[in-house]
Amino acid sequence: MDPKTPIETVAETVATLIMEGKVLGFGLCEVNADTIRRAHAVCPLTAVQSEYHVMHRAVEFSGVLDVCAELGIGFVPYSPLNRGFLGGAINEFTRFDPSNDNRQ
């Protein structure tokens, strides 16, 4: 999404595509509670996706989960195992590609 384009404009475009039968639903990723409300007011959101796991719980405190529950929007957690760290895929022997090091 172009950050210079108002979310309402995006939602209007998606609503048109839904009415034309070209799109089944409207979802957003990594947005704040205000953006969710603004978009949902124009075109009902089906789902919101954000990073959420025991080490990254920002959506609990930012109002994202609350607004999704209030408006009946599905929430899809991204990286529930923290990109493999919580599942044991990453340990002290893991070697990272310097050109794609996500530890930063």
State each model region's role.
Residues D2-Q104:
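Beta/alpha (TIM)-barrel catalytic core signal, keyed to glycine-rich beta->alpha loops juxtaposed to Asp/Glu
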